[in-house]
Amino acid sequence: MTPRDRAGRVLLVEDSEGGAQLMRIAFGERLPDAVLEVFADGERALDELDAGRLAEWDLVLLDLNLPGVKGHEVLAAVRSAADERVRRMPVVVLSHSEVVDDVLRSYDLGANSHIAKPHSLDALFETVETLGRYWLSVVSLPN
């Protein structure tokens, strides 16, 4: 996920401290140059979006079952953001639900991928690396 000029920045929106810690360890081992920041709820992600700071990230890993503002609400807000870079940013939904309606709703709202928890770290990082490489190559193109 790391391009020639900078490390990728990944935002994980995850309320489970155990899940967040697992991701910190996995990122440290598999993508040590990537910057991973964790928000424990969807409200924080929406605050960052409202403040215009969500564009600082290159990829969002988004849990669906968050306290307060749910993951689908965050995803809908990202996809309707005023900033085109934010609207197009890759979003990977992470969910314990494999209910077809939940998966379809994620894609209908614009998710780039929907990965069921507990997830295979290999599958997750393959997705992160593929979307990350693509996104970092797109955002570095001249306007």
Q: Could you say what each language-model-derived stretch is?
A:
Residues 7-27:
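Conserved acidic segment of CheY-like receiver
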Residues 62-64, 95:
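Active-site residues of response regulator receiver
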Residues 38, 66-69, 100:
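Residue-level signal for the "D+5" position in two-component response regulator receiver
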Residues 38-59:
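Acidic, metal-coordinating helix/loop segments flanking the phosphotransfer/catalytic sites
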Residues 119-130:
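C-terminal output helix
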Residues 85-98, 106:
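A short, hydrophobic beta-strand element within the central beta-sheet of small alpha/beta folds
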